[in-house]
Amino acid sequence: MQIHRLPAFSDNYIFVLHDPGQNIAAVVDPADPQPVLKKLAELGAELVAIFNTHHHSDHVGGNRTLLQAFPNTVVYGGEQDRGRIPGQQHFLKEGDQVSFAHRRAEVYFVPGHTRAHIAYYFPPTTGEEWGELFCGDTLFAGGCGRLFEGTPAQMVDSLSKLRNLPETTRVWCAHEYTLKNLQFALTVDSDNSHLKNRFKQVQNARNLSQPTVPSDIGLEKQTNPFLRWDQPHLIIHTKSNTPVQCFARLRGMKDQF
């Protein structure tokens, strides 16, 4: 399975998954149909599936146009997004699986950013080291999504699921927010040498207009404060009594950053 990262709008990423053997493709969160149609034409591939993580327009905005171009495409989304994702035919819940390119993705229910958000995790195949996580706006490189419909406790539970994935899991998040996320992270975790090194690397990459996605779970566990809410120094820094309170205060600080 080949993964093509397509930039869209000011900071979105769309991911086209390609199976060269069958010459079929799937797309994750097609915000804008045009770059997807262009990539499919370049590949000469037929679109067979749309994997949506949640209902926001900058993730599902291309669904209808892509369905017009490829009427047999199957649209997947979360069970609780019924009626909110254009063209949705499959309503997924925790523990479900979806198939593409002779691989099966495990579905995780990860509410917080929205009440219905899901993520897709492709475990590594035999002989491969890396798994692939498509997590929409739940986990970002260096950050996490705002809480529009969920609670801090829900988001901590959701991020815990993703944090528990193998460290050799690539994180394909849907926005190029990494530099600003790490700028915030340094204000609350300034003694973190891994974080300082990562910030320099990301700063250099963005100065060259290079993408910083994908990340990986191992790196996020070292440097992302929103996966480190149970670290004693962050609990102390935020004057919190519990990990969930620490997360909530970190999220509130980031919202004002």
Curated annotation (Swiss-Prot):
InterPro entries from the UniProt entry: Clx_II_MBL (IPR035680), Glyoxalase_II_hydrolase (IPR050110), HAGH_C (IPR032282), Hydroxyacylglutathione_Hdrlase (IPR017782), Metallo-B-lactamas (IPR001279), RibonucZ/Hydroxyglut_hydro (IPR036866)
A GO MF term: hydroxyacylglutathione hydrolase activity
Top-level division of the source organism's lineage: Bacteria
Cofactor binding notes: Binds 2 Zn(2+) ions per subunit.
Cofactor(s) the protein requires to work: Zn(2+)
Residues where Zn(2+) 2 binds: D58, H59, D137, H175
Keyword annotations from UniProtKB, A to Z: Hydrolase, Metal-binding, Zinc
Residues that bind Zn(2+) 1: H54, H56, H113, D137
Pfam family, one: Lactamase_B
Family assignment from sequence similarity: Belongs to the metallo-beta-lactamase superfamily. Glyoxalase II family.
Subunit structure: Monomer.
Protein name: Hydroxyacylglutathione hydrolase
Source organism per UniProt: Acaryochloris marina (strain MBIC 11017)
Gene from which this protein is expressed: gloB
